[in-house]
């Protein structure tokens, strides 16, 4: 599970991305293309500017739907006093979000360090829904991934690639042709004299119950090897298909996979919808997709933060979930 630490993920030249887009829709072509992209084996990180000494940590997990508004997202998170933000669906060098490195920008607004890794290399540009002072007509990097921002010092950030249970290259929905697979980003965080492992994860939206359970099982195996005896926090968009509060529903097998290894769901989550209509999403079929689970940690005060800023602007099709860790 090694990941090469870098200051910036290695770019893929535009002409190379065009070659990928022209490849035949075959699994072998995708595998070869992915193996040739250095960024898939890298993790970008920047240290937090200062340590944190406190016994209660406020944590958020937020699918920011490409992160069109990092400044507004940071304002909401600051109001919650958040120390650690587990992030999914974050753009870097994408036309649709003004070519911004949205994780780095969010971290800067919060005064946090950050880590970021590549989930998908996007091969088709999407127009921006807001105006930017940029004449470009293509993605500068085409990076879409997951990561975190942190006020806590952290070490050994790592990428965990998940089982491929759906295809985004051979038959991409909505023209979103991509190279890559779903993944998680984990690191070891320190608060005072205590350490714990935090993990941001995004499970496959097009998977069935068995596919999501297989991805969760692979994630848990990797975290067992990485964390050893340290406590673990997992948070993110699990794309579950059960009713709100349904962490005890045996049909969604991923919950049981984690519970069997000592993870708790009940104290970490409120029962409620975490999706909404947004700039890019119709908001149809609202569900609870976003969850925390913990092992070896005391979690309290779970909450859902609406992804709507002070003037009513919707920042994402997912609300943020929050909890407090008592260390």
Language-model-derived ranges and their functions:
Residues 8-9, 16-44, 91-192:
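Structured beta-strand-rich core segments of catalytic domains in phosphoester-bond hydrolases
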């Amino acid at each position: 599970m090694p990941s090469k630490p870098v200051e910036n993920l290695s770019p893929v030249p535009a002409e190379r991305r065009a070659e990928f887009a022209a490849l035949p829709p075959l699994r072998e072509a995708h595998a070869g293309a992915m193996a040739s992209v250095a960024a898939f084996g890298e993790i970008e990180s920047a240290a937090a500017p200062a340590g944190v000494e406190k016994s209660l940590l406020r944590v958020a997990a937020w699918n920011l739907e490409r992160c069109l508004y990092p400044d507004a997202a940071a304002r909401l998170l600051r109001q919650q006093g958040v120390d650690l933000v587990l992030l999914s669906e974050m753009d870097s060098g994408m036309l649709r979000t003004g070519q911004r490195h949205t994780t780095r920008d969010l971290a800067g607004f919060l005064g946090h360090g950050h880590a970021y890794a590549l989930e998908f290399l996007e091969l088709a540009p999407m127009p921006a829904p807001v105006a930017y002072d940029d004449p470009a007509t293509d993605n500068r990097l085409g990076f879409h991934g997951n990561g975190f921002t942190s006020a806590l010092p952290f070490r050994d950030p790592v990428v965990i690639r998940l089982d491929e249970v759906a295809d985004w290259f051979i038959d991409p929905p909505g023209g979103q042709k991509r190279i890559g697979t779903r993944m998680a980003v984990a690191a070891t965080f320190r608060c005072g004299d205590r350490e714990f492992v935090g993990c941001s994860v995004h499970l496959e939206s097009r998977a069935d119950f068995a596919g999501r359970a297989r991805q969760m099982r692979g994630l848990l195996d990797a975290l067992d090897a990485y964390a050893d005896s340290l406590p673990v926090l997992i948070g993110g968009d699990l794309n579950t298909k059960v009713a709100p509060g349904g962490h005890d529903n045996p049909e969604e097998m991923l919950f049981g996979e984690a519970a069997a290894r000592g993870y708790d769901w009940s104290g970490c989550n409120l029962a409620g919808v975490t999706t909404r209509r947004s700039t890019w999403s119709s908001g149809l079929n609202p569900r609870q997709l976003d969850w925390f689970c913990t092992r070896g940690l005391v979690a309290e005060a779970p909450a859902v933060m609406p992804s709507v800023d002070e003037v009513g602007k919707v920042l994402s099709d997912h609300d943020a979930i929050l909890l407090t860790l008592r260390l």
